[in-house]
Amino acid sequence: MELILQGTEITPPIRFGLDRLPADGIRRLTLDRQEASAAGGYRRKAEGTDITVSAPDDSGFMYALLDLAEELHGGIRPEDAEVVPYIRNRGIKFNIPLDARVPSYTDAGTSAFMNIANMWDMEFWREFLDRMAENKYNVLSLWTLSPFPALVRIPEFPEACIDDVMVSAVPVKATTRGIGMYSEDMADHLVTVRKMTIEEKTEFWRQVMSYARDRCIQVFLFTWNVFTYGTEGNPYGITDDQYSPVTREYYYYGTRALMDAFPLLAGIGITAGENMTFRGSSEVNKNPDYKMDDIDFSVQTYGKAVHDYLQEHPGREFRVIHRMQMARYKDILHAFSRIPQEIDISFKYSQAHMYSSTRPQFIADFLEEKDPDTRFWLTVRNDDFYMLRWGNPDFARAYLLNMPVGDMIGFYMGPDGLIWGRDYFSRSAGEHPLFVDRMWYMFRIWGELSYNIHRPDSWFVRLISGRFGIPEEEAEALYEAWKEASATVQETTCVHWHNFDFQWYPEGCCMRDDHAEKIIFYTVDEFMRCPSITGGEYASVAETAEALVHRRPTERISAEETAASILRHAEKAAEILGRFDASGTENGELRRTIADIRAFVRLGSYYGMKIKAAIRLCMYRATGDETARSEAVDLLEKAAEAWRSYSSLISGNYRPQVLPRLGAKIDVTDFDEITDLDILIAKNMQPDRAIR
């Protein structure tokens, strides 16, 4: 292949793309740098085996070459193309378990414990960052409660840092607020998994950020506050007290030290909680206990440090992102204007459940309140599926198209309830591949469509065909079955809504009672009471039953319609899989994928029947109609069978793990007997005509 360079040179990102090209298929490749194109996008002109790619920057060239390589490897003849990135910044939210002594929000779980050593393995980061680039993600946000001690030596607080990388043989106490996650008994049972000085740690993360730059990925650091893990026993008087002058100095100088140590760090994200003065609901606009003290801490520490550092280093680019959690938009802007320091705003778009409505309404008030020129980031919480391989491009496309893209800087997607490091769930993981490799289809769907929203269904069919080495006809069937099965739990969550991940874990139909510190399986009576998604187009079970009792239509999509839709998705997926014969395949990944789709079908069937039963029990309570109760009992008996079938599949393919946001080891087979209680609940229920 003849390579012609016009206005550019072979940089590491371009080399990464070139190395993916096959040996044959191109006679002449011209790379032409043109500033007029959209940042990160490209134009391609194809004349037979002569290809010209025009792009304004390295990322545009890299993505163009990756797309070209994929087409050529798939036997597709390249055609003219133009891509303008749909969303400029497409990110991953990664809660990072650096050390038992400096936990992240997610460290009270199996995946964090197993991944601590991996976070200090450069080979892991090469794999992970390569995968991000291949899937068109260009922002990596690393989230931790107490970043400074494991990353830098602060000149003003030189002893407030930790050497080596350690885990503890004593588990982390589960908490939903990040408080008390490193204790004396953990300290008494520390084990060193990697010997490193703090200077070597700093150099390690410089290398990670350098490699990220070579894949056109910006790295951000996000914190919660106020947490001073890793400074225990310090001689300076650093504590978690946000009013302490010493603590404020520690945060101020720590932020400056981060900026100085990591020239490639793109910015820092700030949360006004979870360990600050205001500990009420995140619905701050409705809470009389809310006050400005927490935002003031952010201003006087992070904000002032960034402002002062940039004044001294005017060529440095650095973003400050303030989350809307436990803070009011106008208060944030007003407080930071006093420095003054320009900031970005971040909003949690679907609360903890992105797999719900394609048009979440939680952001509606903020969009009305914000200044017209305010641009913001979206946090997109991916906390519904830790085991099952999700795959529904139709849902992702609609979700992305409904985002307020014109006002956005970008988004970052990821969980609080799992570490997206190496996979320790799968019983057949072998060498423990990247979690994002097991979830490759989900990872690809969101990255690709947020970059190129115009990717058609046929593109994903070819992707599946190439991944599994199956004919396109079979790939099309698998695409449809996967899409239909994945839709079941999304629709369930729209009817059975709880804001937070610990309140609703769909793969286990359970929640954590934070006060009692117990795992509770959601029985049918809870489904009867549970609201539907806030501000959405879905009616709850109770609303639907009331409408049916009074023979009037619901203003929103009824829970009966939703349950019927869930069951149709499950039945269609099952019917397609019944025609799809992969019994003789030697492709283990394909077999495991089909098993996951079957598990989705059974879980969806369970939820569809349980919702229908809950509606009928609401009607029975209101009217005493025994027919409604009889139908509910029949549905719940079938639902219990579906659950057992689901749990059997899960237990055969996945190891139970301690999930940090639930604070316990979740084994779905433990709930088999509880599903039978739903039948007894229905049989023992008494009518309450006062409801009518």
Regions found by a protein language model. Give the residues of each.
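Feature activates predominantly on carbohydrate-active enzymes
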Residues: M1-P13, E35-G41, K45-T247, P263-L264, ...
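Short acidic low-complexity segments
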Residues: L18-R33
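Solvent-exposed, polar/charged alpha-helical surfaces in well-ordered, non-transmembrane soluble domains
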Residues: Y63-L66, D130, S210, E249, ...
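Catalytic-core regions of glycoside hydrolase
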Residues: N95, N115, N138, V152-A160, ...
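C-terminal non-catalytic alpha-helical accessory regions
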Residues: P415-W420, A429-D672
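A eukaryotic intrinsically disordered, low-complexity regulatory tract that is acidic and Ser/Pro-rich
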Residues: R661-R692
